[in-house]
Every structure is written in C-alpha cells, then in structure tokens.
Amino acid sequence: MNVDAMDPQQYDAQLDVKRQKLAQLFVDFETPELEVFASQKAHYRMRAEFRVWHEGEDLYYYMFDKAQNQKIRCEQFLPASQLINDMMPELMAALRPNPVLRHKLFQVDFLSTLSGEILVSLLYHKQLDAQWQEEAQALKEALSSKFKVDIIGRARKQKLVMDRDFVIESLPVNGKQLTYKQVENSFTQPNGEVAIKMLEWAIDITRDSSGDLLELYCGNGNFSIALAQNFNRVLATELAKPSVDSAQYNIEANQIDNLQIIRMSAEDFTDALAKKRSFRRLEGVDLDSYDCNTIFVDPPRAGLDDNTLSMVQGYERILYISCNPNTLLDNLKVLDKTHKITRFALFDQFPYTDHMESGVLLERR
C-alpha cells in the first residue's frame, strides 16, 4: 500500500499513465483503439483486509505502507466501499472493550457488496471456544441493527460461522439484475462498478455470436452467466470446489438453462478435448455435441500454459481477460500468428496501483 498515491485529484492522470503504458506495451501488434473503463475515484473496492494492533487498552486497524516503511493506523480507508468504511468504526468500537473478542485478534477481513451485504472475518492466534461463539453471536445481533452482516471466526484449523460464510451480490448489467453468491476466501472481482463494465463489454463484443461458448477458469460463473444470453450453450470449467458450488447456485438464481459447469483444471480439460486422457468428471458430458466457435479465458497471472495456448488457437474467436499484461503479451506473440486483435480494453480494477486489467477479442485471420 502507498498512502500518498491514493489521491482522487490525481486519479485521471494516473489512469492516463496506465493507458499510455498499455498501449506502448502492445505497440508491436496491430490493435484497434484502446477502450478505457475508469473506476470510481474512492470507495471502489468491495473487499479489504486489515491487521489489528494492540496497544494497551487501545485496539485499531492498520496497514503497512511500503513506501514509508511503516504501519499506518486506519480509521477509514479510501479505496474500500462506503459500506466497509461505515462498518469499520462500529466494529472496532464493539471489539475494543470486549476481552473475549479482542484477545489474540490479529486481522479483520471485510467482504461487501453493491447490494448492501457485508461479511466480517475475525482472525485469531488462539482456538475459539463456546464463550467466543456466544460473544460473536451477540456482536452480530448488535451490528444487525444497522447492517446486513454475517461474522466468521477463524483460527488454525478452525472456522466458526454466524450465520453465513457468503454474501449475495446483485449487479445491474445492461438493465438486468444478475445475482452472484460470493463465498469468503474465494475469488471475486474486487471492484464492483468496474466488474459491471467488464461484463457489459464482454456481452457487447459477443452479441452476434453463433454456436456455443467454452470458458476456462470460470470462477463462480461471473462471466459465463452474463454471456449465456449470447450463445446456444455454454460449457465452463473451474477447479476450485467453493467456486464451482457458487457457480451452480448462481446458475439457478439467474434461471440460466444453457450453462454447464465442470470441475476441472484448464490443463486437464485441454487433455480431455485432445482425447489424451479420460476423466470420471466428464462421464455423461458429450464434449463432441458442443459447437464452440468462441472460447473465453481469464487465466491467473501466469497466463496460459503452452498446451492450453495451442488449444485456444483452434477457435474462431478468443476472448481473453488478463490480470497481467506481461503474460498477455507473451501469449499474444503466439496467438497473433493465427488471430488478429479486434477489440482492446483497459479496466481499472485497482486505482492508485500499477496493476492493469485488460481484455482483448481475437478473431481468426
């Protein structure tokens, strides 16, 4: 964290620097005009994590500022959602005088939504007992007079939940509300407003699609649920079980009837498509019945591995969302041989940082 960089008056200039950097990084490729999707300048981040400092009777949140090489007391936090900022003082005021809840508490995590729900995780260097659970339940009831809140207590090999370990998000996407279950400690898009812009961009660039869609790394179904309207059928893969469970919930909640989720890694699915290996998880799934002209990938920071990269080249259109422009650059050196970039976007998920989220649509040459 760099506190000095978090200046809303400097946001537009910082975003312009990112735009220039991204455009320059891909200068050797033939790209269309870069579409830039800005963030809110404050209160854009739907989750936040704070360490907790004990100082006599005092107790407070802090973060470490690498630029200043010191810990910074956080009464409020400009990047965090307004809901998190509203919760921060209320929670700390309740924790500070409570010896059971504050003892050996070392971290507080918040997960909030645009729909008004918030999940608070309290992390401890001690085992949690019945007395802790009783006090935590009373804390939840007290906070519930102002917030739609759930509380989780975590310790080594221990997790106690009052009453849910998830929130339900509702995103307005092109005039339609999309519902998403977001589970604690599972990946969710951190910037709610930019997440909406990403979904709307993906819907727009696939609007006239034919055939089916294959998505790798689908998470909780964030994109596949939004894109299902543009395709006959959608087949999506995800390895993390909590994310797959959330995706199944989200399919039902949004009444999607043309989307199937398979719990597999992208690498294993690539082998399955190539008929290199058979997998029990694919029993009853007729891969040959799918007519996937478009593939959607949103890989981790390492980008696509060589086998997956070769596999995606077999599709007419590739929609690639990247959280690391350097690995996207490496992947495009291969993909550019068979496909051309027809849409190019920058999504500012993380203002006041060097992080750049980008998206490209590639179509066969």
Swiss-Prot record:
InterPro entries: MeTrfase_TrmA_AS, MeTrfase_TrmA_CS, SAM-dependent_MTases_sf, TrmA_MeTrfase, U5_MeTrfase_fam
The keyword S-adenosyl-L-methionine belongs to this UniProt entry's keyword annotation: yes
EC number of the protein: 2.1.1.-, 2.1.1.35
Catalytic center residues: C323, E357
Catalysed reactions, as listed in the record: uridine(54) in tRNA + S-adenosyl-L-methionine = 5-methyluridine(54) in tRNA + S-adenosyl-L-homocysteine + H(+); uridine(341) in tmRNA + S-adenosyl-L-methionine = 5-methyluridine(341) in tmRNA + S-adenosyl-L-homocysteine + H(+)
GO molecular function: rRNA binding; tRNA (uracil(54)-C5)-methyltransferase activity, S-adenosyl methionine-dependent; tRNA binding
Residues that hold S-adenosyl-L-methionine according to the record: Q189, Y217, N222, E238, D298
Keyword list, A-Z: Methyltransferase, S-adenosyl-L-methionine, Transferase, tRNA processing
Family recorded in the similarity comment: Belongs to the class I-like SAM-binding methyltransferase superfamily. RNA M5U methyltransferase family. TrmA subfamily.
Protein name per UniProt: tRNA/tmRNA (uracil-C(5))-methyltransferase
Organism: Shewanella loihica (strain ATCC BAA-1088 / PV-4)
